[in-house]
From Swiss-Prot:
It is found in: Nucleus. SUPFAM superfamilies: Metallo-dependent phosphatases. This is Lariat debranching enzyme A. GO terms for molecular function: metal ion binding; RNA lariat debranching enzyme activity. A divalent metal cation 1 binds at residues 8, 10, 228. Binds 2 divalent metal cations per subunit. It comes from Xenopus laevis (African clawed frog). Residues 484-499 have a biased composition (Basic and acidic residues). A divalent metal cation 2 binds at residues 39, 84, 174, 226.
Length: 534
């Protein structure tokens, strides 16, 4: 089975599908599945754009709305995770995952699915320590703070993923696992992105939460994006005595722009007896059921259960009996139903509604999913909490009028002052102040990076300092780290044997025999300072 892996989408669905179709015709092959590693930008209308953390002048509708309305249909089954430039209000409707359009599936805050026997896991968002232990409390209309915190990874998702025991074939994250750069060609990476140097040397680049998952899950492949550079690494895991050694092939890809390495084809073994449809993963569903009482929908910090004598249960890994119970709940049908439905008005280019406000809808897909498994819809719970809070505030106001009290309970206040240090009003790129690249630029200019803010309340006990013997020195003279993934085991770039093993770049003047001309519609926006600000 051939799987296309794409880095940051940035709403360029048409261009990505055109590129894959061009490749299929050129190489006389067929791509079975597309995986997108975040910044998908499933924007349906003008209200959704207001929920996307990008500078105002870069808010563009792009073409997803055509796939949402049914004007177009994705030619390839597409699975994606969220990044840090998303229509968060829409993705928030599907906390457990679901169809954002026909043939386009979102994995939720975290999730695991199967396709033709290949097990695919993923986690959405990027890591920020100050929001990590909070709940998913955000809801539209977002403030300037919550429009960013909405896409920050939460500890509950990492905790649930760490309960998994069955082997994982593919795992997706938007930001890189911290320390993964020690397993690839750092010299070549820093040649392309010199402003990463200090963070690489300090071992602060990337997500410690993703690194913890990498050490626990040990998937065969791990794909990421976010830093807008192609980078390959090979990590041999340290296993216990008697266990079969495992290794992970890591690949990060660029964003969808001309002359950029944003797409790669990977060959994967699959089960030909399995149907060509997306299926639920029983172990993951069992974990969701077991951890439903751990949900936190407030901005208060919340510690996950540990084996420290304070919790009655801390191990939520699943037995075969529990998975059979989930199978019974599903009526022994693990196929993910194609139950997409339009839930809001779609953008009309002939009648734009710039004053349209964001919507916060209880999606029928989530309602159906929760009903089948006895889960809690986070959107319903957040809405109920807001209503209760409003009633409480009204009561407090009435009491204040009668007794002269000016006390404010402030239950929903969120301290995000840390974000203010990285605001760059002159930024002319899609990246907002939360992007690690911009933080690297700040380092280059001699300014303190806001990314590495020690938070002693967050304990990543499983993150280890990588041994020198397993790290690739930044002085290594490897010709191309981008070939490492291709050389390891059976992974191949599409077209191997016919041409050089290099990932597909989209050329702005590229024309194949089929007459496909691939040129980015909004390319002019990025040309001026693309290389220095990416």
């Amino acid at each position: 089975m051939k799987i296309a892996v794409e880095g940051c989408c940035h709403g360029e669905l048409d261009k990505i599908y055109e590129t894959i179709q061009f490749l299929e015709k050129k190489e006389n092959t067929k791509v079975d599945l597309l995986l997108c590693c975040g910044d998908f930008q499933a924007v349906r209308n003008e209200g959704d754009m207001k929920c996307m953390a990008v500078p105002m002048k870069y808010r563009q509708m792009q073409t997803f709305y055509k796939y949402y309305s049914g004007e177009k249909k994705a030619p390839i089954l597409t699975i994606f995770i969220g990044g840090n430039h998303e229509a968060s209000n829409y993705l928030q409707e599907l906390p457990y995952g679901g169809w954002v359009a026909p043939n386009i599936y979102y994995m939720g805050y975290a999730g695991v699915v199967k396709y033709r026997g290949v097990r695919i896991g993923g986690i959405s968002g990027i890591f920020k320590s100050h929001d990590y232990r909070k709940g998913h409390f955000e809801r539209p209309p977002y403030s300037k703070d919550t429009v960013r915190s909405a896409y920050h990874v939460r500890s509950i998702e990492v905790f649930k993923l760490k309960q998994l025991k069955e082997p994982m074939d593919i795992f997706l994250s938007h930001d890189w696992p911290r320390s993964i750069y020690h397993y690839g060609n750092k010299k070549q990476l820093l040649k392309k992105k010199d402003f990463f140097r200090q963070e690489v040397e300090d071992n602060t680049l990337g997500s410690p939460a993703a690194s913890e998952l990498l050490l626990h899950i040990q998937p065969s492949y791990w794909f990421s994006a976010h830093l807008h550079v192609k980078f390959a690494a090979f990590m041999q895991h340290q296993n216990n005595v008697g266990e079969i050694p495992k290794a992970t092939k890591f690949l990060a890809l660029d964003k969808c722009l001309p002359h950029r390495e944003f797409l790669q084809i990977v060959d994967m073994e699959h089960d030909p007896s399995k149907p060509e449809c997306l299926e639920y993963d029983l172990e993951w569903l069992a974990v969701l059921k077991a951890t439903k009482d751990l949900l936190n929908i407030t901005s208060k910090t919340w510690n996950m259960p540990e084996n420290n004598g304070l919790h009655a249960r801390w191990d939520f890994s699943m037995s075969e009996e529990t998975k059979r119970e989930v199978l019974d709940d599903l009526g022994h049908d693990i196929k993910i139903p194609c139950n997409f439905s339009v839930t809001t008005a779609c953008y009309d280019p002939n009648n734009p509604q710039y004053k349209r406000m964001p919507t916060h809808i209880v999606n029928p897909q989530t309602t159906e999913f929760c009903a089948r498994l006895g889960l809690v819809d986070l959107n319903v719970k957040v809405r109920q909490h807001e209503e209760e809070k409003e009633d409480f505030d009204m009561t407090e106001d009435n009491e204040a009028d009668s007794i002269g009290s000016a006390e404010d309970p402030g239950e929903y206040s969120t301290d995000t002052s840390i974000l203010s240090t990285s605001v760059n009003p002159d930024e002319i790129t899609l990246e907002d102040d939360d992007e690690q690249e911009d933080e690297g630029i700040a380092e280059k200019l001699g300014e303190p990076s806001p990314e590495y803010t020690p938070d002693l309340s967050v304990n990543f006990s499983n993150i280890r300092v990588l041994p020198d013997s397993m790290a690739v020195s930044s002085d290594d003279a490897t010709d191309s780290t981008n070939d490492e993934l291709d050389r390891s085991e059976s992974s191949q770039t599409e077209g191997e044997g016919k041409q050089s093993n290099r990932p597909l770049k989209r050329m702005s003047n590229e024309n194949g025999s089929g007459g496909v001309k691939i040129k980015r519609r909004n390319q002019a926006i990025y040309q001026a300072k693309d290389d220095e600000d990416e």
